[in-house]
Design a protein with these regions (language model features):
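A structural "hinge/loop" feature
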Residues: 58-81, 103-106, 131, 186-197, ...
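Extracellular/periplasmic solute-recognition and catalytic clefts
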Residues: 145-155, 167-169, 226-237, 254-314, ...
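Alpha-helical secondary-structure segments
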Residues: 55, 134-141, 173-179, 183, ...
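Detector for C-terminal structural segments
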Residues: 229, 238, 327-365, 378-379, ...
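Surface-exposed binding/hinge segments that line
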Residues: 49, 120, 155-204
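Gly/Pro-rich hinge or "lid" segments in bacterial periplasmic/extracellular proteins
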Residues: 76, 94-96, 192-248, 252, ...
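Ligand-site clamp/hinge motif
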Residues: 211-214, 240-286, 422-425, 434-443
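N-terminal lobe/hinge region of extracytoplasmic solute-binding protein
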Residues: 55-112, 143, 216-219
Length: 588
């Protein structure tokens, strides 16, 4: 999962149709975990305001397990900030199209007709054990380790038969050269941004990176020492060898559990937690008004839309009219207003106009996208009956004569999604689908559904990038395709859809630097999207960042916006972890 494509810490939904093949729908929201209280910083860490731990709580964590493997701990939101706090990338490409920020790679240059990328590395980086970070580590990481390790560690697709990467080599101790087979104008923002660098001298000895828990991590990030670990909270203290002079500006990070949106709210209201990415209903009344000078909320719309996603390889989700009818049957405005308290605007069936209006220029695309997203149960029923669906009384039957059923599963503490899935269930009942809400106790009871072949649908939100390319690439490209039953975190292809036409259009987009030709490819992809509707966008994906400046300033905010504002989004969180400063300095 990754702004990276598919980074959890975002809502999910799984849907199931009952017939020859039953379907399940799992809807997830922005928080979960057993209740916890704030722990105290280790005695070795000063408890002054300048050095107290920045305390965070997030969404979806059961009892913590000591797993700091950045390749496998990504299923839990707490595991997401392992990348950013411990492990770092080469170039930070912030969400929302902001300017790329040099990181471990301080400069880069394209040559050979834009097919060769040379990365010049920082020369003063050390791993937390004091060993220098060099091109050997970068080449090892980008290639996906050695041999069999690539099954777990190949984030760039270097070992895939269809890879566009011709070679990755070191050019001395502090430069790396990546040669591509064809031009890829999106390589840095959609491929290289997935990469984080691990120490070759540690990981080359790991026999099975899929099961390795990395209990004592060696990393290059700003917070690498596990100062305390319990099943309810843990503390990362700063890296004594960190390469950015004077950073991090704070002494430690602490992550604690919260069982629900309400319990997380209680923790931040009391001052026990400084930062959370949990939904807060009526946030002005419930939180910011309690201490206007210090309590803040920044709900940035820097992510792709929340969408209803189906396993398009399974019946009846392989039927385009069925997918379109579901889009027509869902009342997006009510979900936005009642389920999300107006913080998440409803989208069209295209889903990208809010984030990328400059890329949606065709009038026919706009009209069709609006029509498919207009709440109209009567039109939805006609779409279904025209496609061979029938009714037995008020019950919808698929073309094979089987009843259609969608059970919506949601973690009980995620109050916004409990409300939203109730609206969805009611909408589906109105067109004859047997739909009900099923409450799940925690993340561990829900998460296995995402990759199960028995549960072919989910609600998914991937991180925003500088253009719609990443959105279309995840959902239309043969190169991003992930077979049913496998984890699609790295590519975001949870609906298991692929398109030869979409792949060709994406290639056209990648292989040109001409903005007009890129726009032409984008418009063609938009038209293809509305023809096929592989997933159903519902509303803009908000990034719930609720934070207190009683002890810390310099958070990502409307006045200080530099990327995705939540702490689970890599690589943007690298910016937050190195910029957040003690109270008394400028900024919110």
């Amino acid at each position: 999962m990754s702004r990276s494509a598919g980074s959890p810490g975002r809502p999910w939904l799984t849907v199931t149709a009952v017939g020859a093949l039953a379907a399940l729908v799992v809807l997830v929201v922005a928080t979960v975990s057993p209740a916890a209280v704030r722990g105290t910083a280790p005695s070795a860490i000063s408890k002054t305001a300048a050095h107290k731990c920045l305390v965070m709580t997030g969404s979806g964590d059961p009892a913590f397990v000591r797993n700091f493997n950045p390749y496998t701990a990504t299923g839990l939101p707490s595991g997401q900030f392992i990348k950013g706090a411990l492990y770092e990338g080469l170039i930070v490409t912030p969400a929302g199209g902001l300017k790329p920020v040099p990181w471990l790679a301080r400069t880069w240059k394209w040559t050979n007709g834009n097919k060769t990328l040379t990365l010049n590395l920082a020369k003063n980086v050390k791993w937390s054990d004091g060993t220098p970070l060099t091109s050997v580590d970068v080449v090892y990481s980008l290639k996906g380790g050695n041999g069999a390790q690539a099954k777990t560690m190949d984030l760039l697709g270097y070992t895939r038969p269809d890879t566009n990467i011709a070679s990755i080599t070191a050019a001395g101790k502090y430069a790396v050269v990546i040669k591509l087979k064809t031009i890829d104008s999106q390589f840095i923002s959609t491929t290289l941004n997935l990469a984080f660098i691990v120490p070759q001298h540690i990981w080359a000895k790991v026999k099975n990176p899929a099961t390795f828990t990395n209990p004592h991590p060696v990393a290059s990030g700003p917070f690498t020492t596990i100062a305390r670990f319990t099943t309810q909270d843990y503390v990362f203290s700063k890296n004594a060898h960190y390469w950015q002079a004077g950073k991090p500006l704070i002494g430690c990070l602490e992550y604690v559990q919260a069982s629900s949106n309400d319990s997380a709210l209680a923790l931040i209201q009391s001052g026990q937690v400084d930062w959370t990415h949990n939904f807060v209903a009526n946030v002005d009344k419930a939180y910011t008004s309690k201490d206007p000078a210090h309590f803040h909320a920044f709900y940035a719309t820097t992510a792709y839309p929340q969408s209803l996603v189906f396993d398009t390889t399974q019946y009846p989700y392989n039927l385009v009219p069925f997918r379109k009818a579901l889009s027509q049957a869902i009342d997006r405005q009510s979900i936005s207003k009642l389920g999300e308290y107006g913080y998440a605007p409803a989208t069209s069936a295209l889903g990208i106009e809010f984030l990328f209006p400059q890329w949606v220029t065709d009038a026919s695309v706009k009209a069709q996208a609006k029509a498919l997203a207009t709440y109209n149960p009567t039109a939805a029923k006609k779409t279904l009956t025209d496609a061979g669906f029938t009714y037995k009384g008020s019950q919808l039957l698929d073309p094979k004569g089987n009843p259609v059923k969608l059970d919506i599963h949601v973690i009980s503490g995620w109050s916004d999604w409990v409300a939203s899935d109730q609206i969805i269930a009611k909408n589906l009942q109105a067109i004859g689908i047997d739909s009900k809400e099923v409450l799940e106790p925690d993340w561990n009871s829900w998460y296995p559904n995402a990759s199960s072949t028995k549960n072919p649908t989910l609600l998914w939100q991937v991180g925003g990038q500088g253009s719609p390319f990443g959105f279309f690439n995840a959902n239309l490209s043969n190169n991003a395709y992930v077979a049913p039953g496998l984890d699609a975190t790295n590519t975001g292809n949870w609906e298991h859809y692929k398109s030869d036409q979409g792949t060709a259009l994406l290639q056209q987009w990648k292989q040109t630097l001409d903005p007009s030709k890129q726009q032409a490819a984008a418009t063609a992809l938009e038209k293809l999207w509305l023809q096929q509707l592989p997933i159903v966008p519902l509303f803009v994906g908000p990034r719930w960042s609720t934070y207190s400046t009683r002890y810390f300033h310099c958070f990502d905010s409307p006045k200080n916006h530099f990327g995705d504002p939540i702490f689970t989004t890599f690589p943007d969180n690298s910016l937050s972890f190195t910029q957040i400063c003690p109270g008394g300095k400028a900024g919110q």
